[in-house]
Swiss-Prot record:
GO cellular component: extracellular region
Propeptide position ranges: 26-86, 105-122
MF term (GO), any: toxin activity
Stated family: Belongs to the scoloptoxin-08 family.
Protein name in the entry: U-scoloptoxin-Sa5a
This protein's UniProt keywords: Cleavage on pair of basic residues, Repeat, Secreted, Signal, Toxin
């Protein structure tokens, strides 16, 4: 951005000098040099502008791609959360069904704590 302003300033300066030389009646050789300089500066300025546009477009494209990736990841995460919430009651029932509960059992006069599968739903 700063470079393009500098180039614009130089271009304007060259144009002013070219006009000034034409008004003062400078010889044709100097006029041709100035004209070539102005053309070269103009061409360089246009190329720089094109490069800046391409960089800006590329950066914008990359930012959009990053946003799309983040949206996709977020959407996938939300979908997984919804699936887990839908499956939660079913999982809870399965856990209760298969849960082992401690019970006391008398064995030769000694109380032992043993784990017996829960008989809910059987």
């Amino acid at each position: 951005m700063i470079f393009s302003r500098i180039m614009r300033g130089l271009l304007c300066l060259c144009l002013v000098l070219t006009v000034f030389e034409l008004i003062n009646g400078s010889d044709e050789f100097e006029h041709q040099d100035s004209l070539h300089l102005v053309k070269r500066l103009w061409r360089n300025w246009e190329e720089d502008q094109q490069k800046d546009r391409e960089k800006r477009l590329w950066r914008n494209w990359e930012e959009e791609e990053q946003k799309d990736r983040e949206k996709r990841l977020w959407r996938n995460w939300e979908e997984e959360e919804q699936k887990e919430k839908r499956n939660l009651p079913e999982l809870k029932y399965e856990m209760e069904k298969n849960q082992e509960v401690p019970q006391l059992k008398r064995k030769r006069g000694i109380l032992e704590k043993i784990w017996i599968p829960n008989e809910i739903g059987r």
